[in-house]
Amino acid sequence: MPIFNPDNVLLSDARTGAVPSAHGTLITQQVIENSKIMQLGKIIEMTDNAGNPVMEKEFTYLAEGPGAYWVGEAEPIETSKAKWLEAKIVAKKLGVIIPVSREFLHYSVAGFFSEIQPLIAEAFYKKFDEAGILNVDNPFEVSIEQSVAAAATGVEGDINYDNILAVEDKLIENGFEANAFISTVQNTTALRNAVKTENGVATPIYDRSSKSIDGLPTVNLKSAEMEKGVLYAGDFNYLYYGIPYTLNYQVSEEATLTTITDGEGKAINLFEREMIALRATMDLGLMIANDKAFAKLAPVAEP
């Protein structure tokens, strides 16, 4: 039986299946490199004991480390236990639909994915971050936004020196320390102006060269759903994600895309416009181990 070679098979002859391994790996790498959740969180290998991928995975995490004791000569050393807790991460299927020209049907499968893989990756990581951070169109039971609400760790006010410290203090009060911030590029001006002046000496809390807030790494979430004036702080050691399965795809020529519209707001009919649509799917898991590990600064809500 001939071996499938994506370099030699036209997309028109292979309209469904797994994304070719090399391109699937590149897409996954691009998602990992650009997703803010994946940049800051910890990955969980979502496989069973035999190494097979699973959509749900139970795991343990270190909630409290072992203690240490002063010991005199000839005295027994006390036994100290670390505190480990059980958690479960659940994956959901994420699909993206990308309409492209019919000419791509004459590309090889490999050539097609070489052209389109950046678009697929961007669609995946934007959607995953919006769900896991902002709780927008979220299939998971958790998100950073939900954690802030559950733990009551929100601070209302403008982005300034004192309010940023107040957000960090919300975590400190619960026994956590922030190790990163999530911001948006729209906050840059406010962050540059977040300065404390004492005795004529101005101390900025934002470092423009390293793009850090209070010495902590800061990433900008590129999303229209991320409001100007919002900052998230957290101990991202309590944020977990998983990628259990390889990517799959399907090509359609006749569908009407109701979730994608043209410049006039009309649904796109592929047949009428001589287009095709790629539907790619990726399984992603998300877990937040402690709501109190996250806090948020947001503008005062309008009455």
Model-predicted segments: where are they?
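Alpha-helical scaffold segments that mediate packing/assembly in large oligomeric complexes
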Residues: V96-N174, K296-P303
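Assembly/oligomerization interface modules of large self-assembling protein complexes
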Residues: T16-V96, N160, A293
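Short loop/turn segments at secondary-structure transitions that flank enzyme active sites
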Residues: G65-G67, G95, F104, K126, ...
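Structured loops at beta-to-helix junctions and adjacent beta-edge loops in soluble globular domains
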Residues: N49, T60-A63, S101, T184-Q186, ...
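Protruding loop/beta-arch "assembly-hinge" segments enriched in small, turn-prone residues
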Residues: M1-T25, K42-I43, K266-P303
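Extended oligomerization regions of viral-like shell subunits
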Residues: G154-F271, I276, M282
